[in-house]
Amino acid sequence: MKIVFMGTPDIAVPCLQKIIDENYEILGVVTQPDKPKGRGKKLGMSPVKELAIENNIPVYQPVKARDKEFIDKIKSLNPDVIVVVAFGQILPKEILEIPKLGCINVHVSLLPKYRGAAPINWVIINGEEKTGVTTMYMDEGLDTGDMILKTEVNLDENITAGELHDKMMNIGAETLKETLRLIEEGNAPREVQNHEEFSYAPIMNKSLGNIDFSKSAREIHNLVRGVNPWPSAYTTYNDVIMKVWKTKVLDEKSTKDVGTIIDVSKDGIKVSTIDNVLLIEEIQMPNKKRMLVGEYIKGNTIETGLVLG
């Protein structure tokens, strides 16, 4: 089976590696153009491009996937399947219609829930107890195509978006492997999504990390996990931005105004919310590294009675 692979960030790398390991004929890899990276702003390759070059696979980097020249190139390759994993551009109908056996997408949610750009973050922010990977046949909509396979994953109440991202990379690759096997055999299932049950996972932005202490301790805990490592949760302490990296919901209440620092100890900062007390265990002050509160207070003071935010 001849495959064209389209993907860009590190979450797509295990999927490409799995296709290489399974000895499919890879006609080419399509990835986003090189971008300036680091302080020197030198052009850097995407993780997918690096893997392709290591394996002597031709690489294509269209600025726009709808350009006629690029579409003609993919047509000339004549793939049986196009596999898309976090490519970063919307594919036009002309490309979706090229492969004989379809364009296959690996999406890191249990569709139709959490369509869109940031499902890993939003399942945690919303306090979901499970998520998963869905493979599907692509159509012109945003993650609306017919589903092939699903793999469910239970969510620990303390898992962060970064940890879940790393977990899903490998689960996605295994689900893709099974999907491609079924497609090659002609046995791939095809299930229409229930479009009435959909939800969206919009792209993340920095303001999402701003903690609102008038919410429940559990909601704040979920936010802190869901925006870790990016865009990261934050509040203000004495008019200075304080990033919040790790929290715990305590089985105790407070009558203080929301956001009030109730107590500071080696265990962390106790803060009042609309219901339970939230323990902030790890913070980061401007121009400093991340630190457990117990370490930070050895050389710095955090005052009780002050209100965060």
UniProtKB/Swiss-Prot annotation:
Q: Which residues cross the membrane?
A: none
Keyword Ribosomal protein appears in the UniProt entry:
no
Q: InterPro entries, alphabetically?
A: Fmt, Formyl_trans_C, Formyl_transf_N, Formyl_transf_N_sf, Formyl_transferase-like_C_sf, GART_AS, Met-tRNA-FMT_C, Met-tRNA-FMT_N
Q: What is the top EC class of this enzyme, as a single word?
A: transferase
Recorded catalytic activity of this chain's protein: L-methionyl-tRNA(fMet) + (6R)-10-formyltetrahydrofolate = N-formyl-L-methionyl-tRNA(fMet) + (6S)-5,6,7,8-tetrahydrofolate + H(+)
Q: Name one GO molecular function term.
A: methionyl-tRNA formyltransferase activity
Q: Which UniProt keywords apply?
A: Protein biosynthesis, Transferase
Q: PROSITE patterns in the record, alphabetically?
A: GART (PS00373)
One GO CC annotation? cytosol
Q: What is its EC number?
A: 2.1.2.9
Presence of the UniProt keyword tRNA processing in the record: no
Annotated binding of (6S)-5,6,7,8-tetrahydrofolate, by residue: 109-112
The text of the family note is: Belongs to the Fmt family.
The function of this protein is: Attaches a formyl group to the free amino group of methionyl-tRNA(fMet). The formyl group appears to play a dual role in the initiator identity of N-formylmethionyl-tRNA by promoting its recognition by IF2 and preventing the misappropriation of this tRNA by the elongation apparatus.
UniProt cross-references to PANTHER family, sorted A to Z: METHIONYL-TRNA FORMYLTRANSFERASE (PTHR11138), METHIONYL-TRNA FORMYLTRANSFERASE, MITOCHONDRIAL (PTHR11138:SF5)
Q: What is this protein called?
A: Methionyl-tRNA formyltransferase
Source organism of the structure: Clostridioides difficile (strain 630) (Peptoclostridium difficile)
Q: Which gene encodes it?
A: fmt
